[in-house]
């Protein structure tokens, strides 16, 4: 029910409609459901690797992983709030920093250390220092989110320090990436 052939769906509405399927025009791929399918043990290695490949193909940017793509452009009350957020901001197609480390850890669970490092390096504030004119935030702070591809300010970081990213990054790095 949750596997869609290349990735795990986001969820199911109260009316039974699947969210995050290949057939969806908006909100087709979601990062969190795929990372947690691996971390929870629901995904077998074959599906887990396909899910991570889909994350990389559809959600990876030079600034980190977007939460979903393509972003929602039409409000849909059956899905909820995310469909009312401007495309490319916050929960709707932005690089929301807090859950990015879940994908790093998931890659490590599957033995994909190189992929975990690629994801890590993209979000790491220090590694974005040469893009400061775009990022416009401190090079030592994770930010709540980085504006996603669908927005004209793609790559601009927002709300420094207002995030749980540092704790999750530390956990993913020390408990998964370093062994």
Model-derived features: positions:
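Acidic, mature catalytic/reactive cores of soluble proteins
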Residues: 1-179
